[in-house]
């Protein structure tokens, strides 16, 4: 084994020289240069500095503007709440621990940080899945005479919390566990060991299948069908410049949304699966830290893609920030043209 396993931790370094110490008790500067911990703390501070205002503004603007409080926007508020969970439950903790060079909050703190970071990330993940399903149902109309209402939106939000809890709670009660990972300043699910009594193997397989492969397949299917519907509408109305413009805009949005999903989750899931299937192989502390950066940064680019790209949200945000006036109102209004002749429009399938 090219690492050192201890009670509730795994250090990616063989203890041949006797320098390896518990990440709950001693600085881990023997793993990487102390400057790396400063960079980690600075990155977390940047995520908080940008992620908190954007997501908080989303909630505030929705409360202030009644026209935003529609069932189709409930899942976006849920996404903002999930990102705030990651900001307060994960990023603030990592700043504090990176300043010390180890997980100074102990075993209980590791469980709390790991739980909130996982819960927030999973709520965000399943919010994107529900969002894709909602757009597919509204635009492609696979169910005739179906009208999306408030009860459906609430069920969608409840579903995201149920699925997120189904991933974040088990490690607290004995099915897998939370341990320090990467540079040992943040905690995550144990992909690294086959510790007796925790059934890590079955949990990782369950998580990879249910909480990555299935969401990826659903998002791909829904946006693929949506894109086909938009292109069919555009082909049927080739003489309409409005329809052609809507088709191009929607296609661009779909591509951005799928790429954003993959950038967020593919690196982390791939590395976690590699570590799990190659336990005992040699890898450095940055091997898991860097992919985690992509997943954590979703608290910034998720609202940018799914909220700020939505014309209605963007207009209300600018109005709120500019004390009730939108200096770009003419430009915003001109770009909200909808296709009357078809059931597909850029506003109905936009990220919000």
Swiss-Prot record:
Gene3D superfamilies hit by this protein: Rhodopsin 7-helix transmembrane proteins
Membrane-spanning ranges: 37-61, 74-96, 111-133, 153-173, 203-224, 253-274, 287-308
Origin superkingdom: Eukaryota
GO cellular-component term (any): photoreceptor disc membrane
CDD domains given in the database record: 7tmA_MWS_opsin
One GO biological process term: G protein-coupled opsin signaling pathway
Site for Plays an important role in the conformation switch to the active conformation, residues: 113
Glycan attachment residues as annotated in the record: 2, 15, 200
Cellular location(s): Membrane; Cell projection, Cilium, Photoreceptor outer segment
Protein topology in the membrane: Multi-pass membrane protein
PTM comment, free text: Phosphorylated on some or all of the serine and threonine residues present in the C-terminal region.
Disulfide-linked positions: 110-187
Chain spans, region Disordered: 331-352
Alphabetized InterPro entries for the sequence: GPCR_opsins, GPCR_Rhodpsn, GPCR_Rhodpsn_7TM, Opsin, Retinal_BS, Rhodopsin, Rhodopsin_N
Similarity section: Belongs to the G-protein coupled receptor 1 family. Opsin subfamily.
Protein name: Rhodopsin
Organism encoding this protein: Gobius niger (Black goby)
């Amino acid at each position: 084994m090219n690492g050192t396993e201890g009670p509730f931790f795994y250090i990616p370094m063989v203890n041949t020289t006797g320098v390896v110490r518990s990440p709950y008790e001693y600085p881990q500067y023997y793993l990487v240069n102390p400057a790396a911990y400063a960079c980690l703390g600075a990155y977390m501070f940047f995520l908080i500095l940008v992620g908190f205002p954007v997501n908080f503004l989303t909630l505030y603007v929705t409360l202030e503007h009644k026209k935003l409080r529609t069932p189709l926007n409930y899942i976006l508020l849920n996404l903002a709440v999930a990102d705030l969970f990651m900001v307060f439950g994960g990023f603030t903790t990592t700043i504090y621990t990176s300043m010390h060079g180890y997980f100074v909050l102990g075993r209980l703190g590791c469980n709390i940080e790991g739980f909130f970071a996982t819960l927030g990330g999973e709520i965000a993940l399943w919010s994107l899945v529900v969002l894709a399903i909602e757009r597919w149902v509204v635009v492609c109309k696979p169910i005739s005479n179906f009208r999306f209402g408030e009860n459906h939106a609430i069920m969608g939000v409840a579903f995201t919390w149920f699925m997120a809890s189904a991933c974040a709670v088990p490690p607290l009660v004995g099915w897998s566990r939370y341990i320090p990972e990467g540079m040992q300043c943040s905690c995550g699910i144990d992909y690294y060991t086959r510790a007796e009594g925790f059934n890590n193997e079955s949990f990782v397989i369950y998580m990879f299948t249910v909480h990555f492969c299935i969401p990826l397949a659903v998002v791909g299917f829904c946006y693929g069908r949506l894109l086909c519907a938009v292109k069919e509408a555009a082909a049927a109305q080739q003489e309409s410049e409005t329809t052609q413009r809507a088709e191009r805009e929607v296609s661009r949005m779909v591509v951005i949304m799928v790429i954003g999903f993959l950038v967020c989750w593919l690196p982390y899931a791939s590395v976690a699966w590699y570590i799990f299937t190659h336990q005992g192989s040699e890898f450095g502390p940055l091997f898991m830290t860097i992919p985690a950066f992509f997943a954590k940064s979703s608290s910034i680019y998720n609202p940018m893609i799914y909220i700020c790209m939505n014309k209605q949200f963007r207009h209300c945000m600018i109005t709120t920030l500019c004390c009730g006036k939108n200096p770009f109102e003419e430009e915003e209004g001109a770009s909200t043209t909808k296709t009357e002749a078809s059931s597909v429009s850029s506003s109905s399938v936009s990220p919000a």
